[in-house]
Amino acid sequence: MNDELCISVTDKEKEEKILSVLGLCARSRELIMGVPQICDALGSEKKKGKGKYPLIIFESSDTSPNTHKRISDKCAYYKVKHIRLATDGGTLAQRLGKTSMLAAVAVTNKNLCLLAEKYI
Protein backbone atom coordinates (compact mmCIF):
# COMPACT_ATOMS: atom_id res chain seq x y z
CA MET A 1 0.00 0.00 0.00
CA ASN A 2 1.15 3.52 -0.74
CA ASP A 3 1.76 5.14 2.67
CA GLU A 4 1.59 8.75 1.50
CA LEU A 5 -1.98 8.18 0.30
CA CYS A 6 -3.30 6.78 3.61
CA ILE A 7 -3.30 9.20 6.56
CA SER A 8 -4.86 8.96 10.03
CA VAL A 9 -6.26 12.05 11.75
CA THR A 10 -6.22 11.91 15.55
CA ASP A 11 -6.19 15.61 16.53
CA LYS A 12 -9.71 16.52 17.74
CA GLU A 13 -9.59 20.15 16.54
CA LYS A 14 -8.50 19.15 13.03
CA GLU A 15 -11.12 16.42 12.92
CA GLU A 16 -13.90 18.83 13.95
CA LYS A 17 -12.91 21.16 11.11
CA ILE A 18 -12.82 18.25 8.65
CA LEU A 19 -16.29 17.16 9.79
CA SER A 20 -17.53 20.72 9.28
CA VAL A 21 -16.15 20.72 5.74
CA LEU A 22 -17.79 17.33 5.11
CA GLY A 23 -21.09 18.79 6.31
CA LEU A 24 -20.68 21.62 3.82
CA CYS A 25 -19.94 19.06 1.09
CA ALA A 26 -23.09 17.13 2.00
CA ARG A 27 -25.24 20.27 1.82
CA SER A 28 -23.78 21.14 -1.59
CA ARG A 29 -24.27 17.54 -2.83
CA GLU A 30 -20.57 17.08 -3.56
CA LEU A 31 -20.23 13.98 -1.39
CA ILE A 32 -20.52 10.26 -2.16
CA MET A 33 -21.71 8.34 0.91
CA GLY A 34 -21.17 4.62 1.46
CA VAL A 35 -18.48 2.12 0.52
CA PRO A 36 -20.34 0.45 -2.41
CA GLN A 37 -21.11 3.81 -4.03
CA ILE A 38 -17.51 4.97 -3.57
CA CYS A 39 -16.10 1.76 -5.07
CA ASP A 40 -18.50 2.04 -8.03
CA ALA A 41 -17.48 5.66 -8.60
CA LEU A 42 -13.78 4.75 -8.42
CA GLY A 43 -14.28 1.88 -10.86
CA SER A 44 -16.06 4.02 -13.41
CA GLU A 45 -13.96 5.92 -15.88
CA LYS A 46 -13.37 9.61 -15.43
CA LYS A 47 -15.47 11.25 -18.12
CA LYS A 48 -15.92 14.97 -18.33
CA GLY A 49 -19.40 15.95 -17.28
CA LYS A 50 -20.53 12.39 -16.57
CA GLY A 51 -20.85 11.33 -12.96
CA LYS A 52 -18.80 12.37 -9.97
CA TYR A 53 -15.32 11.02 -9.29
CA PRO A 54 -13.95 10.77 -5.71
CA LEU A 55 -10.94 13.01 -5.10
CA ILE A 56 -10.42 12.21 -1.40
CA ILE A 57 -11.97 9.50 0.79
CA PHE A 58 -12.64 9.77 4.52
CA GLU A 59 -13.14 6.51 6.44
CA SER A 60 -14.61 6.13 9.94
CA SER A 61 -12.60 4.46 12.69
CA ASP A 62 -14.93 1.51 13.30
CA THR A 63 -14.90 -0.09 9.85
CA SER A 64 -14.20 -3.80 9.66
CA PRO A 65 -10.74 -4.98 8.55
CA ASN A 66 -12.21 -6.22 5.24
CA THR A 67 -13.85 -2.87 4.52
CA HIS A 68 -10.66 -1.01 5.44
CA LYS A 69 -8.64 -3.23 3.10
CA ARG A 70 -11.19 -2.79 0.31
CA ILE A 71 -11.05 1.00 0.58
CA SER A 72 -7.26 1.07 0.98
CA ASP A 73 -6.68 -1.16 -2.03
CA LYS A 74 -9.03 0.87 -4.24
CA CYS A 75 -7.37 4.12 -3.13
CA ALA A 76 -3.89 2.77 -3.79
CA TYR A 77 -4.85 1.43 -7.22
CA TYR A 78 -6.63 4.60 -8.37
CA LYS A 79 -4.19 6.92 -6.54
CA VAL A 80 -6.85 8.64 -4.44
CA LYS A 81 -5.97 10.10 -1.04
CA HIS A 82 -7.42 8.08 1.85
CA ILE A 83 -7.95 9.60 5.31
CA ARG A 84 -8.92 7.54 8.36
CA LEU A 85 -10.78 9.59 10.96
CA ALA A 86 -10.97 8.89 14.70
CA THR A 87 -14.75 9.38 14.51
CA ASP A 88 -17.03 6.34 14.48
CA GLY A 89 -19.57 5.67 11.74
CA GLY A 90 -22.57 6.77 13.81
CA THR A 91 -21.08 10.16 14.62
CA LEU A 92 -19.98 10.65 11.02
CA ALA A 93 -23.51 9.90 9.79
CA GLN A 94 -25.05 12.20 12.39
CA ARG A 95 -22.78 15.10 11.40
CA LEU A 96 -23.79 14.63 7.75
CA GLY A 97 -27.52 14.42 8.44
CA LYS A 98 -27.96 10.67 7.95
CA THR A 99 -29.69 8.25 10.30
CA SER A 100 -27.74 5.04 9.70
CA MET A 101 -24.01 4.40 10.09
CA LEU A 102 -21.54 5.51 7.42
CA ALA A 103 -18.27 3.67 6.89
CA ALA A 104 -16.83 6.11 4.36
CA VAL A 105 -17.54 9.29 2.41
CA ALA A 106 -15.80 10.77 -0.63
CA VAL A 107 -15.49 14.41 -1.69
CA THR A 108 -16.03 15.03 -5.41
CA ASN A 109 -15.47 18.80 -5.70
CA LYS A 110 -11.89 20.00 -6.24
CA ASN A 111 -12.20 23.21 -4.19
CA LEU A 112 -13.93 21.48 -1.27
CA CYS A 113 -11.27 18.78 -1.44
CA LEU A 114 -8.54 21.41 -1.09
CA LEU A 115 -10.41 22.95 1.85
CA ALA A 116 -10.60 19.56 3.61
CA GLU A 117 -6.91 18.83 2.89
CA LYS A 118 -5.97 22.11 4.55
CA TYR A 119 -6.96 20.66 7.94
CA ILE A 120 -5.10 17.35 7.60
Spans of model-derived segments:
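Short, compositionally biased "basic patch" segments
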Residues: 1-21
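Signal for well-folded cores of large energy- and translation-related assemblies
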Residues: 43-46, 76, 97
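Feature captures the catalytic cores and cofactor-binding loops of soluble hydro-lyases/lyases
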Residues: 49-53, 63-93
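Short basic, glycine-rich beta-strand/loop surfaces that mediate nucleic-acid
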Residues: 78-120
